[in-house]
Regions:
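Active-site metal-binding motif and surrounding structural segment of the metallo-beta-lactamase
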Residues: 45-101, 200
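Active-site neighborhood of divalent metal-dependent phosphoester bond hydrolases
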Residues: 92-97, 104-129, 252-254
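Structural beta-sheet core signal
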Residues: 72, 100-102, 170-171, 246
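Short glycine-/acidic-enriched loop or helix-start segments at secondary-structure transitions
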Residues: 16, 60-62, 83-85, 111-112, ...
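Residue-level marker for beta-strand->alpha-helix junctions and adjacent short loops that shape enzyme
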Residues: 11, 79, 107, 209, ...
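Residues at the starts of beta-strands that form the adenosine-phosphate
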Residues: 3, 47, 97-99, 126, ...
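Core dinuclear metal-dependent hydrolase active-site scaffold
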Residues: 1-64, 129-189, 278-282
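Cap/insert and terminal regions of metallo-dependent hydrolase folds
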Residues: 168, 176-277
Length: 282
């Protein structure tokens, strides 16, 4: 069966976040660091698939304990999900022939960005373009990209469903609102959407706990459905529900603190917070 390793649980800036001197970052020890969200999967055919390429690529490959990924899948163009691409290049790893799976908009951005375009010329990456809803089949697994609404200044955003022999996993690190995402697929409830795509486990956007978490800037600039809202929509977990793990946590998110009321509320309702290095079998 396919083995999933969660390689990071933080929002794009990681934890601690650069220049943050608040208590949420100032007291974070080395063993408490959280890397930007990423995921690695080893398929039954021994191919290795990295989802999102962060600046902490080296640390995350050490967590994964695999050699270079044979495939890289990008959700979108926001920096925390792509700024590790350069580490595969001539100046660092010097990789060759990695298959880079992207949307059409992401393909156009990569080809128009000199530091990425030269990596195509050097053979570091070979581009494969996917379409939303397309089933991309491997020996025992299938990957399905799903378009979801999220700030699209540079490219669109895709979640991924990974279907193994026994389970299906949803990887949804970012989206704007549940209303927009569910509406796009003709659904009104989160459970309904999970059931529509036969999801057994999900890594989903947990960027903020509440709508009032950021100080000094409007949260409307960085829309994400707050975890408190998501669990209010879901209610307590039922035996038939998918396992849900919240990921992509902003450095301000109280879910990092296991003693917080937020953490205890999520756990008491049967949902979970992703753990860096955790594994799932599909």
């Amino acid at each position: 069966m396919a083995e999933v390793t969660l390689l990071g649980i933080a929002q794009d800036g990681g934890r601690p976040q650069p220049l943050c001197q608040k208590p949420c970052c100032a007291n974070v020890g080395l063993d408490e660091r959280a890397f930007p969200t990423s995921m690695g999967i080893k398929f039954e055919d021994s191919s290795t698939h990295l989802f999102d390429a962060t600046r902490n690529l080296g640390d995350q490959l050490n967590i994964w304990q695999e050699n270079l990924p044979s495939h890289v899948w990008l959700t979108h163009a926001h920096f925390g999900h792509v700024d590790g691409l350069g580490l595969f290049g001539r100046e660092t790893i010097g990789a060759k022939g990695i298959i880079l799976h992207v949307s059409k908009q992401m393909q156009e951005l990569i080809q128009a960005t000199p530091q990425w375009a030269i990596m195509l010329e050097q053979g570091v990456f070979t581009l494969e373009v996917f379409a939303t809803g397309e089933e991309i089949s491997f020996e025992s697994e299938t990957i399905i990209p799903l378009l979801v609404p999220h700030r699209d200044e540079l490219s669109d955003m895709h979640a991924f469903i990974i279907r193994g022999k026994e389970k299906s996993l949803l990887y949804l690190p970012d989206h704007d609102t549940w209303e927009e995402t569910l509406s796009l697929y003709g659904c009104k409830l989160i459970r309904e959407w999970f059931e529509k795509f036969n999801i057994n486990a999900a890594f989903i956007d947990g960027t903020f706990w509440s709508q009032h978490e950021l100080s000094g800037r409007s949260q409307e600039e960085v829309p994400h459905p707050p975890v408190s809202q998501t669990i209010a929509h879901l209610g307590s977990r039922l035996p038939s529900d998918a396992e849900v793990f919240f990921i992509h946590l902003n450095h301000t998110n109280p879910l990092y603190d296991k003693s917080s009321s937020a953490f205890k509320t999520v756990e008491s309702m049967g949902w979970k917070i992703g753990v860096q290095g955790m594994k799932l079998n599909l």
